[in-house]
Amino acid sequence: MLDPSARLPFVTPLVLSNLAKEHGAETPDLSFEVNAPTSLKKAASSNGADTIQGAVDVLRALASMYANVGLMGANEAESNAVDAYLVQSDALATAPFQAAMQCADDLDQHLALRTYLVGFRVTAADAAIWGAIRSSSPLLGIIKKHAHAHLARWYAHVDALLAFSSAVTMMAEAKSNMFKNKK
């Protein structure tokens, strides 16, 4: 369940679902509801008992669900790094300017010689940090000023990937439908 009117990295679960779909994995049904908390119902559950709630917990569950396609990295060390970025993304989305600037500095330095945040292919870490940046006005401003060349390069690269761009399109359509239904 995703809220298309939410400000936080609401689009990231769609990206993870799209990445899994690109690798032939079966993905959960996604639904959109205004003012609904981000949640994921486990496949075997028809009642709410096995519902995961909260942005980070949903991202962790989706990344773990699709670990076989590499969303959690290639090994335990990468998996731990991905998890750290998932946690960081939650705080990053609402960080004030000074904290956002420090994080942008750290990410820029980390990405100096890398294409992806963890390992050699896109992971849940890339999706989570991209979603946090996308929902953060200070971070978008920092990237648009090109003061952090490596971070800007990485952001442009992942933003252009089909799984990411189609997630943005899906969420825009859900928002549009939400406003159409209000009339």
Where are these regions (language model features)?
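A short hydrophobic/aromatic micro-motif that marks alpha-helical segments and, especially, helix-coil
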Residues: 93, 140-141, 176-177
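GST superfamily/GST-like fold recognition
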Residues: 117-140, 147-156
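GST-like domain detector, emphasizing the conserved glutathione-binding G-site
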Residues: 1-117, 121, 134-137
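Short acidic/histidine-centered micro-motifs embedded in hydrophobic/aromatic stretches
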Residues: 85-88, 130, 170-174
